[in-house]
Amino acid sequence: MQERIFKIDRELLKRYADASGDQNPIHQDEAFAKSVGLPDVIAHGMLTMGLVGQFVSDWAGGSANVKEYSARFVKPVVVPANTVVDLVVNGVATEENGLYRLELTATVDGLKVLGMAKALVKK
């Protein structure tokens, strides 16, 4: 599977918050995020998972071919002001009886942000 890089910045966080209705201030207000012990504003977990899901769907030839997809959040994606963060996604596909098992990796600055990320697709 070919690696893909997704760009995450504060503007994307704002657009995602507006689209999803998740206006939790840890995703937009730096002072609030720091007041609750975070290093800075963080990306929505479901945004991160959604971007990795897009990687899976694109590789599978469409979302209808994705039979299962799961992951665990292991580290927040910190998005400092005036910065673009690279979410690097790649994976290994193994074919079994016409289905592909994908073992996925999602990292920021070399650190894993999703754990146990996997999918089952028909291609």
Task: Mark where each language-model region is.
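Intrinsically disordered, low-complexity segments enriched in polar/charged residues with Gly/Pro
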Residues: 12, 19-20, 63-64, 91-93
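Catalytic strand-loop segment that frames the active site of acyl-thioester-processing enzymes
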Residues: 1-43
